Amino acid sequence: MLAVLSGLVSGAALYDRLGVWSFVLVVPAVFTGVMFLSYESEAPEHWPAFLFTLTFTLLCSWRMYSVISSPPPENAVFIAEEGTVTEVREWGKVYAVVIDTESRGKFVTFLKFANFTMGTRIKFDGATRDFQPKFPDSDFDEARFWRARGVNGVMSIYNHEELPERVSMAAVRQKISRKLAIYMPALTASYLRAAWVGGRDKNLNDRHKQWGTSHLLAVSGFHVGVVTFIAMFFFGKDVVILSIILWVYIFLTGAAPSAMRAGLIIQIFLLSKIFGRKSESVNSVCSAGVILLLWSPFLFWDIGWRLSIMSALVIAAMFQNGASWLATSPSVNLVTFPQVAYTFGSVPFVGLLLNLFAPIYFSFALTIASLGAVLRFMKFPFSQYLMLAVEGTFMLWEKIADFFASLLPLTVSWNFLTAWIGCGTLTFFLGRYLDLAPLRIAAVMGVVGFTAFALFL
């Protein structure tokens, strides 16, 4: 599946420059190159598997192109609908509110004030329009961002009235968020809102951006892994119960692309146990990536999806080669920071240091905070003192992060060197996974690094 994912990603990356030819020529060419690299020697028995996988790749390529090139649903029409608010997020100086309508899918409306909360049901009338076109001097594409999240267009609401609430995942998320705000200390509530329901506090998010650790607030493989580990502690290896807990948590937190990727990998692992087959970690990551691209090809342009897949590939390839877990965090940072620098302009250098121990720190802190929050909701005696101790733990982290940030106030920008470091490191570990000769790995690292720089230049 590594060859399939490599081909599809390359085709999507070149789509803006080559159009349909990126999926007609680039996808099969990259797929073929990776497949031949993975073969130690040519043998007749390889050809049936190669042709079958090539056919599958071409079908995936056709699916991606047909979705990406298709126009959005017809907009610029007046509609009267009922719907449920599924997401409210800050969007510059306004709020972006996603409404899931009963018959026309999802639309986003931009409001000056947050008049709605998640789970609110409304009856409204308004007009729809297409997304803003991409500006020449901007890398942000509004249409791709929202279409990756299943949103069909922009809605301008003229009149609305609230309807009685129904049970929905969005309503549950809002109730949990409100309870955390009422019963938890402020900082702990912000961290648990991010971990439990995927809601980010703007001030906390800005601080983590300064430290280079904002990925800890996004629900990702880190959070999904912690939840799965805790579930396994209580329920053992019961695949059905673990699967239910896994997907309830993912959808409760908003089903972010990074969380979906982690969920699919864990689900593949759990299913392999049922069928008595050994799950190969790199293959599981690639399978999850391909499934998500087929489900929503626009996810390729989501920075969270790209970082998630790259991180997971590095971790999987390293552990499959028997690497120490101590080397995992710096290796993941080397691979991902060029993408972050390209998207946001630069990354704090201190993040490379803090991320060596931040995941371990937060895995313990969030686990204890979650346990304390449950006890607090159940009104256990003295649970409020446990939450004060947890609040102190998060405050201590801020002091530590601020201290190191003051010592290392440097930033790293995107350039040819960072592009080569990121892609070269990823290629190195994947080359080791494919058991390529050192000279071949070095040659591929150079080609991939140069290609990555040319793609994003």
Regions from the language model: what does each represent?
Residues M1-P71, Y158, R261, F416-T418, ...:
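N-terminal leader/targeting segments
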